[in-house]
């Protein structure tokens, strides 16, 4: 998605340790006009999948998932990273290791909100090593629902997550795939760049 790549080049900040900061427009302060375009693009990419539910994980994916869900006219469910007194009844649970925060989370979704009849589109802001997505896929499978696709805003193509998910045979669409980044000069090279 050229609009997204241009914005990453303009406002993204490359840090040491393969960190790409996009908090000025995507996952802290959110540019709703850009995210609307992201929502339209995911609708175009997954419109044949008959999606009934959007699933993401707290916190960065929630805003993006909500905009995407408007184009599909379906609810959003977000996996919580901790058991809460607000969640009543039984839950689907898995463990997810976070690349960003370097810790393992117990992640849960109430059984009330994922049913075997659901056709789920998973949405997230980043794909790095794939641990979060594998955990979300596990939650969907545990519910008996089907993963119809995964929409990622930014994939770090130099890490293994995309390959892991594609080898599972799941329809994965990443709007920008970063093949390399240089913290010294701030450059980002996207897949398909010449």
Swiss-Prot record:
GO terms for cellular component: cytoplasm. Transmembrane segments: none annotated. Its EC number is 2.4.2.22. Its main location: cytoplasm. 5-phospho-alpha-D-ribose 1-diphosphate binds at residues 128-132. Xanthine binds at residues 20, 27, 156. Homodimer. Converts the preformed base xanthine, a product of nucleic acid breakdown, to xanthosine 5'-monophosphate (XMP), so it can be reused for RNA or DNA synthesis. This is Xanthine phosphoribosyltransferase.
């Amino acid at each position: 998605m050229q609009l997204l790549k241009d914005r990453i080049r303009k406002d993204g900040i490359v840090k040491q340790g393969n960190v790409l900061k996009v908090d000025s427009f995507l996952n802290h302060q959110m540019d709703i006009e850009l995210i609307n375009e992201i929502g339209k693009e995911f609708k175009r990419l997954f419109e044949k999948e008959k999606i009934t539910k959007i699933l993401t994980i707290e916190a960065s994916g929630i805003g993006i998932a909500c905009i995407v869900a408007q184009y599909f006219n379906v609810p959003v469910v977000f996996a919580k990273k901790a058991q809460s007194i607000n969640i009543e009844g039984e839950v689907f649970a898995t463990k997810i290791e976070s690349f960003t925060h370097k810790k393992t989370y117990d992640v849960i979704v109430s059984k009330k909100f994922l049913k075997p009849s659901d056709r789920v589109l998973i949405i997230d802001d980043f794909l790095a090593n794939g641990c979060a997505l594998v955990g979300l896929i596990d939650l969907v499978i545990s519910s008996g629902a089907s993963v119809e696709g995964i929409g990622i805003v930014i994939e770090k193509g130099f890490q293994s997550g995309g390959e892991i998910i594609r080898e599972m045979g799941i329809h994965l669409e990443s709007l920008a795939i970063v093949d390399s980044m240089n913290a010294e000069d701030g450059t980002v090279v996207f897949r398909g760049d010449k």
